[in-house]
Amino acid sequence: MFTRAQVRRILQRVPGKQRFGIYRFLPFFFVLGGTMEWIMIKVRVGQETFYDVYRRKASERQYQRRLEDE
């Protein structure tokens, strides 16, 4: 694992500290978020993607609410 000094050294090597400050890390997180979104949309685990499961669960919840209201 990394020690605190090693992490600090790595973070200090990221350019733009004086001009952008802490915001110099934003592009990394933007790319990371985009990659996660792409994986959730495109990568199939078994036969389903994350959004397939989400849509199915939302539909099941809506159906259960209708049954409870009747």
From Swiss-Prot:
The segments annotated as topological domain Mitochondrial matrix are 1-19
The primary location reported for this protein is mitochondrion
Q: Name one GO molecular function term.
A: mitochondrial ribosome binding
Keywords of the record: Membrane, Mitochondrion, Mitochondrion inner membrane, Transmembrane, Transmembrane helix
The source's superkingdom equals: Eukaryota
Q: Which residues lie on this side of the membrane: Mitochondrial intermembrane?
A: 42-70
Membrane topology type: Single-pass membrane protein
One GO cellular component this record assigns the protein to is: mitochondrion
- Location of the protein in the cell: Mitochondrion inner membrane
Q: Which Pfam families match?
A: UPF0640
Segments crossing the lipid bilayer: 20-41
In its keyword annotation, does this UniProt entry include Transmembrane? yes
**Gene Ontology biological process terms from the UniProt entry:** mitochondrial cytochrome c oxidase assembly; mitochondrial respiratory chain complex III assembly
Q: Which family does it belong to?
A: Belongs to the UQCC5 family.
Q: What does this protein do?
A: Required for the assembly and stability of the mitochondrial ubiquinol-cytochrome c reductase complex (complex III (CIII) or cytochrome b-c1 complex), a multisubunit transmembrane complex that is part of the mitochondrial electron transport chain (ETC) which drives oxidative phosphorylation. Mediates early complex III biogenesis. Participates in regulating the levels of electron transport chain proteins, and therefore energy supply, in response to changes in energy demand. Also involved in the first steps of cytochrome c oxidase complex (complex IV) assembly.
Quaternary structure, per UniProt, is:
Associates with the mitochondrial ribosome. Interacts with UQCC6. Interacts with MT-CYB; interacts with newly synthesizes MT-CYB. Forms a complex, named COMB/coordinator of mitochondrial CYTB biogenesis, composed of UQCC1, UQCC2, UQCC4, UQCC5 and UQCC6; regulates MT-CYB synthesis and promotes its membrane insertion.
What is the official name of this protein in its record?
A: Ubiquinol-cytochrome c reductase complex assembly factor 5
Recorded source organism is Homo sapiens
